[in-house]
């Protein structure tokens, strides 16, 4: 299987599993928690059909990548992404992040610039800053909320995932119509196959402050979010994000949950392909 080495922990290398398909302008898809690059399958198919080269990879600790105990912060995640781009020598690339993956996009552009990047897309994003503080009243939740997630993951991450996906896909509304029990089970299996250290550390990255990164986004951008998102509510994320980046193309998908890559794939793909074609 194809891997890119991004670091070392003691005697073992830290390797990222990736896939690279198609020809044309490269589109790099960066997955969310607690999934893997395979969560993009409905977008990958549409992008390949439209003539793009599609690269997916599993973030450290997730999917088929190595499961180190360290490196779970956005500076390291962005450095890992930079290694992927440099190793594959990608030029004129489009970075597309979903959920947690939007953090890599913002931090990469802020830290490494856009010499290799043509466009960026933020789908169901966590920007600009999820933590509710005195200087950030638009934040989604206080510190105690995120501490509770970490505690739940450490206590029994498998039980946590079951509850997490209920609201990830809004199963009370979409199960049996927009998503099958089997697809939900696959998401759970993917989450369970990831590393414990990654699962426990990831929630502490969600409240990273990206407010200083946003002004450095100097290429065309897309912000797309579902109005029914219970995981990252739109009023705390995309709508505030768009005010900070008014030049971005902005799309709201009516009623879509957080996991809209699957439940509302047609709407997502239509908006993404239109953005790429401009």
Swiss-Prot record:
Q: What is its EC number?
A: 1.11.1.-
Keywords from the named record: Antibiotic biosynthesis, Oxidoreductase, Peroxidase, Plasmid
* Stretches assigned to the AB hydrolase-1 domain: 26-264
Return the InterPro entries for the record.
AB_hydrolase (IPR050471), AB_hydrolase_1 (IPR000073), AB_hydrolase_fold (IPR029058), Epox_hydrolase-like (IPR000639)
Q: Where are the transmembrane segments?
A: none
UniProt GO molecular function: peroxidase activity
Is rRNA-binding set as a keyword in this record? Answer: no
Q: Does the keyword Oxidoreductase apply?
A: yes
Under the heading SUPFAM superfamilies, the entry gives: alpha/beta-Hydrolases (SSF53474)
Assembly and partners are described as: Homotrimer.
Family label: Belongs to the AB hydrolase superfamily. Bacterial non-heme haloperoxidase / perhydrolase family.
Q: What does this protein do?
A: May be a chlorinating enzyme involved in 7-chlorotetracycline biosynthesis.
Name it: Non-haem bromoperoxidase BPO-A2
């Amino acid at each position: 299987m194809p891997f890119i080495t991004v670091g070392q922990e003691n005697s073992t290398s830290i390797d990222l599993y990736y896939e690279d398909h198609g020809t044309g302008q490269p589109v790099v898809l960066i997955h969310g928690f607690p999934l893997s690059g395979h969560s993009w399958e409905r977008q990958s198919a549409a992008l390949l059909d439209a003539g793009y080269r599609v690269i997916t990879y599993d973030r450290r600790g997730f999917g088929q990548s190595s499961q180190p105990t360290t490196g779970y912060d956005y500076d390291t995640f962005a450095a890992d992404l930079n290694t992927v781009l440099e190793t594959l020598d990608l030029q004129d690339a489009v970075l597309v992040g979903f959920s947690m993956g939007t953090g890599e996009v913002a931090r990469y552009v802020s830290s490494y610039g856009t010499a290799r990047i043509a466009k960026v897309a933020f789908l169901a994003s966590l920007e600009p800053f999820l933590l509710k503080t005195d200087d950030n009243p638009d934040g989604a939740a206080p510190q105690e909320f995120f501490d509770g997630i970490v505690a739940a993951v450490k206590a029994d991450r498998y039980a946590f995932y079951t509850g997490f996906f209920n609201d990830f896909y809004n199963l009370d509304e979409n199960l049996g119509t927009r998503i099958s029990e089997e697809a939900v089970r696959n998401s759970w299996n993917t989450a369970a196959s990831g590393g414990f250290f990654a699962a426990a550390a990831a929630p502490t990255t969600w409240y990273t402050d990206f407010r200083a990164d946003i002004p450095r986004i100097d290429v065309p951008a897309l912000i797309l979010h579902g109005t029914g998102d219970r995981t990252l509510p739109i009023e705390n994320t995309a709508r505030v994000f768009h005010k900070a980046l008014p030049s971005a193309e902005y799309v709201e998908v009516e009623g879509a949950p957080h996991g809209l890559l699957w439940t509302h794939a047609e709407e997502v793909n239509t908006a993404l392909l239109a953005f790429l074609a401009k």
